[in-house]
């Protein structure tokens, strides 16, 4: 099982292969991942960094992704503790770390800042480490 964050999901949804390279993994994410990923895709399209067609394809891939939403008991409290420990004002990224910690699995991200800070809390890997 792997927790995936919006950065890795958006990257996959925009790639030619989509999420296929992650098909062998059981993927989970906190509920906020879908809002974050959708927002990133919308912003990329709005800024004209991606075409309308690619945005539509990526959004379809996101909605069809075989990723299970998870909200275990204590997720919010754990995210607050992690944000405090790491000196973060916001709990968005901490929620991914908290989910991985509560489920006793690793977090997969392409976000270097999250990876560097998060390794103090839980196992965090990038796509090349799969």
What residues fall within each predicted segment?
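Acidic, PIN/NYN-like endoribonuclease modules and their adjacent C-terminal/linker elements
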Residues: 1, 34, 97-130
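Short, well-structured N-terminal submotif of metal-dependent ribonuclease cores
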Residues: 1-34, 44-57, 130
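Buried hydrophobic packing segments
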Residues: 9, 37-41, 99
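Active-site-proximal, substrate-binding regions of enzyme catalytic domains
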Residues: 38-70, 75-79
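Active-site neighborhoods of divalent-metal-dependent phosphate/nucleic-acid chemistry enzymes
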Residues: 67-113
């Amino acid at each position: 099982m792997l927790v995936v964050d919006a950065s890795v999901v958006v990257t996959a949804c925009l790639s030619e292969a989509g999420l296929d390279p992650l098909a062998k993994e059981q993927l989970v994410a906190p509920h906020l991942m879908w809002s974050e990923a959708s927002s990133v895709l919308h912003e990329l399209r709005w800024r004209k960094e991606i075409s309308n067609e690619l945005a539509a394809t990526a959004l379809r891939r996101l909605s069809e992704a075989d990723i299970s939403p998870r909200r275990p008991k204590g997720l919010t409290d754990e995210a607050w503790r992690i944000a405090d420990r790491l000196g973060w004002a916001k709990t968005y990224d901490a929620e991914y770390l908290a989910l991985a910690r509560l489920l006793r699995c690793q977090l997969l991200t392409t976000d270097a800042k999250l990876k560097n800070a998060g390794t103090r809390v839980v196992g965090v890997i990038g796509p090349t480490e799969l």
